Amino acid sequence: MAEQDYYDILGVSKDASEKDIKRAYRRLAAKYHPDVNHEPGAEEKFKKINEAYETLSDSQKRAQYDQFGSAGPQGAGGQGFGGFGGGQAYSNFGGGFDDIFSQFFGGGGRTRRDPTAPRQGRDLQYAMTLDFMDAVFGKTTTIKYDRDAECKTCHGTGAKPGKSPITCPRCHGAGVITSVRQTPLGNMQTQTTCPECNGTGKIIKPEDRCDTCHGAGHVHERHELEVKVPAGVDDGQQMRLQHQGDAGENGGPAGDLYIVFRVTPSREFRRDGSTIYVDRDISFAQAALGDEVKVKTVHGDVNLKIPAGTQSETNFRLRGKGVPHLNGNGNGDEHVTVHVKTPKSLNKRQREAMLAFAAASGEDVKGVKKTVLDKLRDAFEDK
């Protein structure tokens, strides 16, 4: 099933301004907030709205989404490019569901975050080193990294199978301890997070705690994941793998994994985006007379025609011989710069040929030390 477009989810056009996106998000979040809308599917709709807003409200993530979409350049679900950033899917205004809700409907100030509300897990980052050619053409590889995963025994509840958390006896489920003290200005009421339940309003009896996670609801694990690196990635780019980060809380989704690519430089090629640059030495004769020479490209050797009279530092473009574009639309180009090399020493025949060339060109090359044979030839020619 195809992923719904983020712009469609928020009901805005692709050229919508940040204000338009924020306005649409507020309107839809208020409509589908779980505390307001109890219809089937409303909570799932609310999650999609938050996911769409999280991407479109961030200029870097939005730019990457516009180019690659939510599925990423290779079309695999849940992969895409974007800047690394922490945060939670439900905290776009600095708080949880209740913070957002209070901004829509007032309430006399900032409300306390609901400790039982679903919260997205922490995002993780993984640095992947790639050989130059693997970055150009892509590869499939397996990575291993540490993450907090939902406990499979208790499915995140923290309690043994058949057991459930109970209402905190200290705060009676409120999650906070309320105290009133007298001041010169009158009675002042304060609230502090309940130390017994850490603000959740629920506790698990020691004897009821899950034997696997000991009541945490998640376990630390070494996770193995197959990653398809798309052709055309570059050094410093990042790819997001959705829901491959730390486990969420209270039924919230897992965080994302951001893979940062580190590409090893090539000894033969220089790269700028999808363009490849190479140097090719040619001789004076090849430059003057023209020739056809072999040139290295990332796609293999190709023949390059050198026109007669080519000057040193001349640049030739080989269309389509560069790096594949990330969007899958063809390849970049390769630029070949030729360098005419002057020989450091000449054998006898080469020297004679060069002197003859100079003479035929009407050049009197100063500083050329003549051999005995040259002097005899000059003597006979003078007679």
UniProtKB/Swiss-Prot annotation:
Entry keyword annotation includes Transferase: no
Domain J: 5-69
Alphabetical UniProt keywords: Chaperone, Cytoplasm, DNA replication, Metal-binding, Repeat, Stress response, Zinc, Zinc-finger
One family name in Pfam for this protein: DnaJ
Renumbered ranges of CXXCXGXG motif repeats: 151-158, 168-175, 194-201, 210-217
This protein's GO CC annotations: cytoplasm
Binding residues annotated for Zn(2+) 1, in chain numbering: 151, 154, 210, 213
Keyword Zinc-finger: yes
Cofactor: Zn(2+)
Main localization category: cytoplasm
A single GO molecular function term of this UniProt record: zinc ion binding
GO BP: chaperone cofactor-dependent protein refolding; DNA replication; protein refolding; response to heat
Cofactor note: Binds 2 Zn(2+) ions per monomer.
HAMAP family, per database record: DnaJ (MF_01152)
Recorded family membership: Belongs to the DnaJ family.
Subunit organization: Homodimer.
Identification of the protein by name: Chaperone protein DnaJ
Species, as recorded: Limosilactobacillus reuteri (strain DSM 20016)
Lineage, uppermost ranks: Bacteria, Bacillati, Bacillota, Bacilli, Lactobacillales
